[in-house]
């Protein structure tokens, strides 16, 4: 059966110390591989309050309890409390996960800063943020990162070329339908994109337009119908918290259906040498507020 790659975004200080560890325990118990992508700089989650003015954000807040998932203290970081430096204070936790055999990679330096700023940023800003994250990862793990997954699926036109320059081997920054090489200006990048292909659990909570009322049943129906390679993104703060039971049920059901569960490294190892060339554009995803980096249809007229 086609594989499902599991990508775990770890956004916060609390998520690194608590949610990521719960997920590692569950995955180890079930003998399932997954990729953990860490935020490596300061936790400024509280500064995300400005998103309250973004269309669709308040609807998501009503469907999913932000306080329950993140905790009051986390929501004060960067506003009423100084943001703890995740890379410096959580290195032992991160190395512990890598030591248990899980793939680890870069999510971001400052999650809120990247998610809210990269879309309008220039090359120097983007280079600085990526370099800070790469260097902190190298300090924590003693080796350079191989994989990058952008915070909030937010990018700009400089990211693919900088990933190539900074030594990343593959990335999962986008939403889409399958692996591709990003079209640059000019040419085509060499760092494959492995886009998230499935909706996240929090994008499905409380919606009335699903194949099944329960988000887990909806995901099972979608993956059975599509029967293709998939990338599923989850969050340490959500599936490593209140959604842990739902995530375990999803994993067990996929296993019962003979789906191979793997990490991004295992998925990337299966790639052919003839990936489609696609532009990365701005688009929307049901259940997620704002615009995201989305895979456009393949281009046949672009060469390296």
Regions found by a protein language model. Give the residues of each.
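Short, glycine-/Ser/Thr-/acidic-enriched flexible segments
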Residues: 199, 237-239
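Positively charged, amphipathic and often flexible ligand-engagement surfaces
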Residues: 193-208
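Catalytic alpha-helical scaffold of carbohydrate-active enzymes acting on polysaccharides/glycoconjugates
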Residues: 1-147, 152-192, 212-232, 239-304
């Amino acid at each position: 059966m086609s594989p499902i790659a599991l990508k775990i975004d770890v956004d916060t200080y609390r998520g690194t110390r608590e949610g990521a560890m719960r997920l590692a325990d569950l995955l180890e118990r079930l003998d399932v591989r997954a990729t953990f992508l860490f935020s490596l700089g300061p936790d400024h989650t509280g500064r995300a309050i400005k998103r309250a003015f973004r269309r669709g954000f308040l609807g998501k807040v009503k469907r999913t309890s932000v306080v329950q998932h993140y905790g009051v203290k986390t929501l004060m970081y960067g506003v009423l409390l100084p943001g703890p430096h995740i890379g410096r204070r959580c290195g032992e936790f991160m190395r512990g996960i890598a030591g248990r055999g899980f793939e680890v990679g870069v999510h971001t330096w400052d999650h809120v800063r990247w998610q809210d700023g990269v879309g309008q940023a220039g090359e120097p800003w983007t280079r600085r943020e990526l370099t800070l994250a790469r260097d902190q990862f190298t300090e924590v793990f003693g080796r350079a990162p191989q994989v990058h997954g952008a915070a909030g699926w937010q990018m700009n036109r400089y990211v693919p070329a900088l990933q190539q320059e900074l030594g990343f081997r593959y990335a999962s920054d986008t939403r889409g339908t399958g692996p591709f090489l990003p079209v640059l200006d000019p040419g085509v990048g060499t760092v494959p994109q492995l886009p998230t292909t499935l909706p996240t659990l929090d994008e499905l909570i409380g919606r009335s337009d699903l194949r099944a009322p329960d988000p887990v049943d909806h995901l099972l129906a979608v993956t059975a119908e599509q029967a293709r390679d998939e990338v599923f993104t989850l969050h340490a703060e959500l599936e490593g918290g209140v959604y842990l039971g739902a995530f375990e049920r999803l994993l067990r059901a996929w296993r019962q259906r003979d789906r191979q569960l793997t990490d991004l490294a295992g998925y990337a190892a299966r790639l052919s040498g003839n990936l489609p060339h696609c532009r990365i554009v701005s688009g929307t995803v049901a259940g997620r507020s704002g615009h995201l980096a989305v895979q456009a249809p393949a281009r046949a007229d672009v060469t390296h």
